[in-house]
From Swiss-Prot:
Residues 189-199 have a biased composition (Basic residues). This is Homeobox protein TOS8. One of its GO terms (cellular component) is nucleus. PROSITE patterns: HOMEOBOX_1, HOMEOBOX_2. InterPro entries: HD, Homeodomain-like_sf, KN_HD, TALE_homeobox. SUPFAM superfamilies: Homeodomain-like. The gene is TOS8. SMART domains: HOX. Residues 176-199 are annotated as: Disordered. It is found in: Nucleus. It comes from Saccharomyces cerevisiae (strain ATCC 204508 / S288c). Belongs to the TALE/CUP9 homeobox family. GO terms for biological process: regulation of DNA-templated transcription. It comes from the Eukaryota. Its main location: nucleus.
Amino acid sequence: MGTSIVNLNQKIELPPIQVLFESLNRENETKPHFEERRLYQPNPSFVPRTNIAVGSPVNPVPVSSPVFFIGPSPQRSIQNHNAIMTQNIRQYPVIYNNNREVISTGERNYIITVGGPPVTSSQPEYEHISTPNFYQEQRLAQPHPVNESMMIGGYTNPQPISISRGKMLSGNISTNSVRGSNNGYSAKEKKHKAHGKRSNLPKATVSILNKWLHEHVNNPYPTVQEKRELLAKTGLTKLQISNWFINARRRKIFSGQNDANNFRRKFSSSTNLAKF
């Protein structure tokens, strides 16, 4: 009980009046410029407006769209700046600046917009290898000399075939072509003989066939036995003999008696020429 009385009688020191006036002046000072940022939200609502001074009343402000009055915060601005920089670096292609440091097109645009040092246009934005120098180095590295007339776009043309090789190829081609033509001619001749087409038969063979035809003028159609006899005498094939008689009948030399007489005269003249 005694201790409580001592505490009540203890002197309490109040702050000086000047300090109180200074605190009031701080409240009446001009407030810093607030940055207005609109955040797109689906449902607009009442957003309270806050002051920097501690203990000031909170007044809700009705707005049509959500608006935040945010005071300047250097730490937050630095974080936002870093986030924007990283986003731009991921989004835009990489280029090189004067100091050979990797920057992005978005970062370059951001520096120009904010007012930082712009990228100078004296140096090209994109680095590339010069084509003539690159191919010139390749040309110098070659062990054997190359003429300029053989270079097209830095590459060498294939060497043409030499004349001697061309002559050799042409000679082989000509020889093969001659052999092929001879083989083709012989095959064609064999084909003609196989099919019994008209060819120059020996005179002795023709005289034998004409003799049989003269003896059988009225019926120039040899039987199977007669054909066998003619095959044995002439040495021809059965197909050749049949074709020869077909052609002889197509000449219409057996149409009448006069034709038969003419045939006899021709046959006699041909036999006389064969004797001579």
